[in-house]
């Protein structure tokens, strides 16, 4: 990505969306070898012109975002204020799509989550249901027949023993409480120390209503730890 390409993309986005303002604009997939400074300047330019609101990145490491924001602070510029990594109960054990997918889920990403918490950067959490692993369609009692509902990327990225054991614990809690597996997975994501907003792909209207109810569900600290297997 370079400044010229970013300007072209921004103008194309405004045109295709038939709007003169984009509320949240995210850069996708970082190239750590590229110079972020001209990119940050363009984003600031479009923000000051009233064409974009908040801006940030998807699949950028927290270290890279921190570097951007430190520079922005030094130059009296507007920093990144939002990020979209993979985050949820499913730990990413392989890169689902290739090309540098960033996850902040699981035991190994404690430092990343602490950075988001300390810097008050909200997370737009993609794959918060593990590509469907925690949608309720996959059942640990019948993995042979229910695994087929997942796409190849979900199997590649999230199908592992640790996640299946976690799914089993969620199923048990769902049975106890009369909630769905997806509701518990979404509630867990929203009740972490990181301020997270789950992004979910839904094909049926009834699923929308079901998932929205997750915003009203409350899990105890013991339940949060029980299903994840690690501290927040």
Question: Which positions does each model-derived feature cover?
Answer:
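Active-site groove signature of glycoside hydrolases
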Residues: 14-35
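Short, acidic/polar
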Residues: 1-17, 66-70
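Beta/alpha (TIM)-barrel catalytic core signal, keyed to glycine-rich beta->alpha loops juxtaposed to Asp/Glu
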Residues: 34-232
């Amino acid at each position: 990505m370079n400044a010229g390409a970013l300007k072209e993309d921004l103008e194309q986005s405004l045109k295709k969306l038939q709007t003169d303002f984009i509320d949240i604009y995210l850069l996708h997939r970082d190239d750590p070898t590229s110079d972020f400074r001209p990119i940050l300047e363009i984003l600031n330019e479009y923000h000051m012109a009233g064409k974009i609101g908040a801006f940030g990145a998807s699949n950028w490491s927290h270290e890279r975002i921190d570097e951007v924001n430190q520079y922005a602070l030094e130059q009296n510029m507007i920093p990144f204020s939002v990020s979209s990594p993979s985050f949820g109960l499913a730990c990413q054990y392989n890169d689902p799509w290739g090309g540098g997918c960033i996850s902040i889920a699981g035991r190994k990403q404690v430092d990343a989550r602490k950075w988001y918490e300390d810097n008050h950067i909200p997370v737009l959490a993609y794959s918060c249901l593990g590509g469907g692993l925690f949608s309720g369609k996959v059942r640990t009692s019948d993995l042979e027949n229910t695994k087929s509902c997942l796409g190849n990327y979900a199997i590649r990225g999230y199908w592992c023993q640790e996640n299946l054991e976690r799914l089993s614990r969620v199923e048990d809690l769902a049975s106890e409480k009369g909630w769905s597996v997806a509701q518990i997975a979404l509630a867990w994501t929203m009740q972490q120390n990181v301020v997270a907003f789950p992004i979910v792909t839904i094909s049926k209207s009834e699923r929308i209503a079901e998932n929205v109810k997750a915003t009203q569900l409350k899990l105890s600290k013991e339940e949060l730890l029980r299903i994840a297997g690690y501290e927040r």
